[in-house]
Amino acid sequence: MKVLILVLLGVVILQAAPIRKLEDLLPTRYPPEHELVYWCTYANQCDFCWECVHGICRNRIQADWPVIHQNDWIINCTVSRWNGICSYYEGPRNHTDHQMDCANPTSHTYPHREYMKIYERDDL
């Protein structure tokens, strides 16, 4: 439910200030800090969305997400924006490229709990 509210809030923010007004973004593995909410909503497996310390990872944007063990679910991503088209590339392992209208974004990733390796306090 909280994720849905976050997504709806993101859509409202995009409607108020469309991302098209932003400059083009050359392909990067490190999007600007002020754009992380946008990118991490639609590309939530990307490593720049997670902060990992000693193998335990927390989502940098969505505080209600579970704490997870660092694992292959978190992937290296490259994001870019050109002429109103936002892209993120899941690679190099997946070699998957997603493109979407920046003003009407769609998520191509979503949490598969069985792959996330959720951290439990009993794991200590």
Swiss-Prot record:
InterPro entries recorded: ASFV_fam_110
Signal sequence region: 1-16
Keywords: Glycoprotein, Signal
Positions of glycan attachment: N76, N94
Record's function text: Plays a role in virus cell tropism, and may be required for efficient virus replication in macrophages.
Family from the record: Belongs to the asfivirus MGF 110 family.
Protein name: Protein MGF 110-8L
Record organism: African swine fever virus (isolate Tick/South Africa/Pretoriuskop Pr4/1996)
Lineage per the UniProt record: Viruses, Varidnaviria, Bamfordvirae, Nucleocytoviricota, Pokkesviricetes
